Amino acid sequence: MENTMKFGYEKHNADTIANTDKKRICAYFTVLDTHKIKPVDIRFRTNELLEEVAKHDDWILESVIWDANHKIDTNREGLNTILDKAKNDEFDILLMYHCMQVSRSGSKTFDWTLQLHQLGKSVYGIVDEIHSFDELAEALHLTVARQKQYEALKKA
């Protein structure tokens, strides 16, 4: 089960986001089980997210996706929601919080991240500090075929 939080987007931020040049941020959090999210977890992670967004003058928070990672290699609803949002141009940057991989397989993570990149979205992983798409790709221990894809992408 995936949860999407809008933080008052429709009520308060729609005009602000529509009338600004700021980059729209979609944050992705994984938790052990979405049925077991505690208010303290939401508060702590939300504060951490808001601190990161505040460091960048040209960023504005659009939405947050919570996803369960108890079945790490299964098709998670949050990932599908993010791809749909990317296809509909609802955000500019994805921040993956406390995760550098969406699967135990580096290739699956790379493929998913590459799809977002091809849709014109920037992807950053945040584990202690912010990591770029290049740093994510280098950390994934890609297969030779995926490494060639990545090298071709860098040259384009």
Question: What spans do the regions from the language model cover?
Answer:
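Short, structured surface patches at the beginning of a domain
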Residues: 1-156
